[in-house]
């Protein structure tokens, strides 16, 4: 891990002292070592019970602080702060909720929730992956391994969703409706990417570079508006190894 710049270290300590806070962690690309020189710093603020965003605003740092739940069910709020020349993203995490989702994942169960910024939605085991890959700075958080039951259950479910998406891609292609067709193709590709990652017992934190991590880079070029839509659907389905679901 790269050493924290002093302003980021100071902010982490301030967040850890807020009422309700139980831990502050370094997350994102800085934690996993995949960052660029210009990458932001991501801090996860884990709390139990409740957290008052006004306490974060009262720290006085320039930027935006959301309300709880304002960003969606998985990313349930946070802040974009500027500390001099350093950009910091703070993500609020209800540890009780995260641990409940983690317990479900241990039994191979999960939901896929609509989440801003995600094409296929975010699986409820995603926050467990954040715990597994983060770097704790203050306090303690669980550090789960990828559950074998999840590795057994998730791939089939994701591929089933891909098959349904390809069915609808075919329907949109038949109607020469390019935008929803492309959307369904992207949905199918990302679902198969999730399936592959689960088979490898690897956590997924978001959809950034997920297609490449899953070894599906070649599929990107198949979603091409210059070819006919039916041909694009057939090419993507073949590349994914998934047959579009037949409605009858």
Locations of regions flagged by a protein language model:
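Conserved NTP/Mg2+-binding pocket subregion across the NTase superfamily
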Residues: 61-173
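Short aromatic-enriched loop/helix-cap "lid" or pocket-rim segments at secondary-structure transitions
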Residues: 37-38, 101-104, 210
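Helical scaffold of the NTase/Pol beta-like nucleotidyltransferase catalytic core
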Residues: 1-25
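Conserved nucleotidyltransferase catalytic core and NTase-mimicking acidic/glycine-rich helix/loop elements
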Residues: 131-248
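Catalytic metal-binding acidic patch
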Residues: 27-62, 77, 81-93
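Hydrophobic, Leu/Ile/Phe/Ala-enriched alpha-helical segments that form helix-helix packing faces
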Residues: 15, 60-63, 240
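A generic local structural motif
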Residues: 9-13, 29-31, 75
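Short, flexible, glycine/charge-rich loop motifs used to bind or transfer phosphoryl groups or to couple energy/partner
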Residues: 14-15, 31-34, 178
């Amino acid at each position: 891990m790269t050493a924290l710049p002093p302003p980021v270290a100071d902010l982490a300590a301030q967040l850890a002292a807020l009422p309700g806070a139980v831990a502050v962690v370094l997350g994102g690309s800085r934690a996993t070592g995949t960052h660029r020189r210009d990458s932001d710093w991501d801090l996860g603020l884990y709390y139990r019970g409740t957290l008052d965003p006004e306490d974060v605003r009262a720290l006085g740092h320039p930027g935006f602080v959301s309300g709880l739940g304002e960003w969606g069910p998985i990313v349930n709020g946070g802040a974009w702060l500027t500390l001099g020349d350093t950009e910091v993203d703070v993500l609020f995490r209800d540890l009780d909720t995260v641990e409940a989702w983690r317990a479900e994942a241990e039994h191979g169960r999960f939901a896929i929730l609509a989440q801003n910024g995600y094409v296929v939605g975010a699986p409820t085991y995603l926050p467990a992956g954040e715990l597994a890959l983060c770097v704790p700075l203050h306090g303690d958080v669980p550090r789960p391994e990828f559950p074998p039951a999840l590795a057994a259950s998730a791939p089939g479910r994701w591929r089933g969703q891909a098959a349904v998406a390809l069915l609808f891609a075919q329907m949109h292609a038949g109607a020469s409706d390019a935008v929803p067709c492309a959307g369904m193709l992207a949905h199918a590709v990302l679902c198969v990417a999730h399936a592959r990652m689960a088979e490898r017992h690897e956590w997924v934190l978001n959809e950034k570079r997920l297609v490449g991590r899953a070894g599906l880079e070649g599929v990107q070029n198949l979603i091409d508006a210059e070819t006919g839509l039916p041909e694009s659907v057939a090419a993507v389905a073949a590349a994914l190894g998934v047959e579009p679901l037949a409605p009858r």
